[in-house]
């Protein structure tokens, strides 16, 4: 049995079907995250009673308009500052992520999708032409040595372990409050020199897929919430009314 660790969830205001996503995330954590200490939700919405009395709620607005992830970083920072006994190592979770089996801290190794170098540059450039998020990622890489070559693109759709002291050092070193090109996972892990492991044991639902290949970690796009069969499967898995 691993030591107990806190879970920090930066939560936005957009939700489908009466906060169904956060209900799924919290239910999966309570059911399967065996090293759970506390769940801490940082958000500007009112506490959701159905999640239980054991949730720690911290109020924080989304105050930045220039970059979405700047608000996520700020919420994690606020959790560190306002919860003095936050566990040294904690896991950051999103409401569009859940787990499907018993999980210990040793199962939470950071996963990367690709290493940014000369051979992968065409792929990254192609993705940046198609999606704004990848433009932000390339700008994130550019902060590091050698124009970012050697940086790893860490999976942004999987709960990931953070160290609160290292995270605060990143906050103090990177002007995320005013600069663009902020992608929290790749920024943090490349800042601390984390090598991670190639992505595995994870499935991302783009359109409500029901077969997750036995993966432990499952994330989903909002479009999956429009698939009744996907929603019903989650309700049954986690006994959500």
Spans of features found by a protein language model:
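N-terminal anchoring/stem segment of glycosyltransferases
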Residues: 1-65, 194-196, 216-241
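Short coil/turn segments at beta-strand junctions that form active-site/ligand-binding loops
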Residues: 3-5, 37, 86-89, 95
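Aromatic-acidic/polar surface patches that form glycan- and anion
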Residues: 11-22, 69-73, 126, 147, ...
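Short catalytic/ligand-binding loop motif for oxyanion handling, primarily in non-cytosolic enzymes
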Residues: 16-18, 47-52, 98-103, 107-109, ...
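A conserved donor-nucleotide-binding helix/loop in the catalytic core
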Residues: 19-31, 62-93
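Short acidic donor-binding/metal-coordinating loop in glycosyltransferase active sites
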Residues: 44, 94-97
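Conserved donor-nucleotide/metal-binding helix-loop-beta segment in metal-dependent transferases, i.e.
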Residues: 100-133
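Catalytic core and acceptor-binding pocket of nucleotide-sugar-dependent glycosyltransferases
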Residues: 132-224
């Amino acid at each position: 049995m691993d030591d107990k660790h806190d879970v920090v969830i930066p939560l936005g205001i957009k939700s489908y079907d009466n906060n169904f996503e956060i209900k799924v995330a919290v239910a999966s954590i309570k059911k399967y995250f065996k090293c759970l200490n506390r769940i801490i939700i940082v958000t500007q919405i009112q506490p959701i009673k159905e999640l239980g009395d054991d949730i720690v709620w911290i109020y924080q607005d989304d105050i930045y308009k220039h970059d979405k992830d700047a608000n996520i970083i700020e919420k994690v920072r606020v959790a560190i500052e306002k919860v003095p006994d936050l566990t040294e190592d904690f896991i950051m979770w999103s409401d569009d992520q859940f787990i499907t089996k018993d999980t210990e801290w040793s199962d939470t190794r950071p996963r990367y999708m690709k290493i940014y170098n000369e051979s992968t540059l065409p792929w990254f450039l192609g993705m940046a032409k198609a999606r704004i998020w990848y433009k932000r990622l390339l700008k994130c890489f550019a902060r590091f040595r050698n124009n970012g070559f050697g940086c790893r693109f860490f999976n942004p759709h999987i709960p990931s372990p953070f160290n609160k002291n290292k995270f605060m050092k990143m906050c103090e070193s990177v002007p995320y409050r005013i600069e663009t090109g902020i992608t929290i996972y790749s920024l943090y892990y490349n800042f601390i020199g984390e090598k991670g492991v190639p992505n595995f044991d994870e499935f991302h639902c783009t359109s409500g897929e029901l077969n997750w290949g036995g993966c432990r970690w499952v994330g989903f796009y909002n479009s999956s919430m429009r698939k009744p069969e996907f929603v019903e499967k989650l309700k049954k898995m986690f006994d959500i009314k």
